């Protein structure tokens, strides 16, 4: 078996959209530094916590949930207050983030939809979901295009392989053992090609591995 996962696809989509406002700064740190540590230093919380806050923020968590991630013992009111403070500190720490969020929310409030990276209309039933829908739709488009390109390359290169699964941002194949290395290279290359297909402003990458079971390649 050969499997591959897209590398940090949500944060790469985040960097892609932020580049309109920060001239690629977030993406540069994401690729070449430690973006969670940089944000932790700015906000004044631990790296572990800022990572939790980042994904809570991107997935649309409310203030109370963010506050409880900081301290599970807080009352609902205190958690909501603390979460609001952390949210604002997070917005202030990342150049262009507040503008990105506000513009996405305004688009949803005005039109009721967003446009994905492939041009499709995405109906959004609440402005607080705008950023999450933007990033998740982008990640989904990239993952599906990655699968298409990978399979096209497999045919062109005459790799003896058969796709077993497509799980979120992961592809799994069975293949001739002699073709495993070529297939791994192809899956990593196809991820980069998927990003180029949509003219993303940050490169897309994947990490491939081989083994005899899904436990080895997942």
Indicate where each model-derived feature is located.
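Conserved catalytic core of nucleotide polymerization and phosphodiester-bond processing enzymes
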Residues: 1-218
């Amino acid at each position: 078996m050969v499997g591959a996962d897209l590398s940090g696809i949500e944060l790469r989509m985040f960097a892609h959209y932020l580049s309109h406002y920060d001239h690629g700064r977030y993406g540069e740190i994401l690729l070449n530094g430690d973006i969670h540590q940089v944000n932790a230093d700015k906000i004044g919380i631990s790296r572990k916590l800022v990572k939790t806050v980042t994904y809570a923020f991107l997935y649309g968590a409310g203030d109370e949930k963010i506050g409880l991630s900081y301290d599970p013992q807080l009352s609902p009111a205190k958690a909501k207050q603390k979460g609001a403070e952390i949210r604002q500190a997070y917005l202030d720490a990342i150049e262009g983030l507040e503008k990105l969020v506000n513009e996405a929310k305004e688009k949803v409030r005005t039109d009721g939809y967003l446009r994905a990276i492939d041009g499709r209309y995405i109906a959004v039933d609440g402005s607080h979901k705008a950023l999450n829908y933007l990033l998740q739709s982008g990640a989904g488009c990239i993952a599906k295009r990655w699968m298409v390109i990978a399979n096209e390359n497999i045919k062109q290169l005459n790799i003896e392989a058969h796709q077993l699964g497509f799980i979120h941002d992961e592809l799994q194949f069975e293949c001739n053992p002699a073709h495993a290395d070529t297939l791994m290279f192809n899956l990593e290359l196809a991820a980069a090609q998927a990003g180029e297909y949509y003219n993303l402003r940050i490169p897309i990458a994947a990490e491939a591995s081989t083994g005899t079971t899904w436990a080895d390649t997942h």
